[in-house]
């Protein structure tokens, strides 16, 4: 019997850790992928390694990219400040084409592995408004994946799985806890220090803290 494989986009944050746990629960042999893309919050890479070990990923791969060479985001350009108060519209923490690039590389690895499912922790409820987290984007990428790959055109189609798409942050946290996620291992902060301590002020920190509060669960986040 062939092993059921999946590629998991694992940033080291709360959402992607939850997705990895859900995929494991579904019986997948999970291969996780993270990206060192020039992000200011590089502590998330160490968090991803911790989560991959805790959840038993078959292999954890870190791909180097220079999205800082493109710029245009507070996460890759130190000259652009990370906002510490809510703002209207798409915030400057949006990284141009990030999820498109990440999914494309995950797709390539999935095809090599013979995996048909790619899991991503995007969410369109408690989120920052990024266009590449929306259901329409995920659906469009899946269509493209099955037109652009050898496996896809030969009838062995890919699925882009986004199980958190319509969940609130509190629902995500409760689901992760049911499936064994240790959120103390994760880093969500956009400007976490080298030790992974959070600022408590950026949009990602606010969403995370509100999620734990609404879920009625102790928040294990370490603050600087």
Swiss-Prot record:
Coiled coil: none annotated. Signal peptide: none annotated. The keyword DNA-binding does not apply. Zn(2+) binds at residues 189, 199, 202, 205. Binds 1 zinc ion per subunit. ATP binds at residues 10-20. It holds the Pfam family QueC. GO terms for molecular function: ATP binding; ligase activity, forming carbon-nitrogen bonds; zinc ion binding. Keywords: ATP-binding, Ligase, Metal-binding, Nucleotide-binding, Queuosine biosynthesis, Zinc. Its EC number is 6.3.4.20. It comes from the Bacteria. It catalyses: 7-carboxy-7-deazaguanine + NH4(+) + ATP = 7-cyano-7-deazaguanine + ADP + phosphate + H2O + H(+). It is an enzyme of class 6 (ligase). GO terms for biological process: queuosine biosynthetic process. Pathway: Purine metabolism; 7-cyano-7-deazaguanine biosynthesis. Its cofactor is Zn(2+). Catalyzes the ATP-dependent conversion of 7-carboxy-7-deazaguanine (CDG) to 7-cyano-7-deazaguanine (preQ(0)). NCBIfam families: 7-cyano-7-deazaguanine synthase QueC. HAMAP family: QueC. Belongs to the QueC family. This is 7-cyano-7-deazaguanine synthase. It comes from Azotobacter vinelandii (strain DJ / ATCC BAA-1303). The gene is queC.
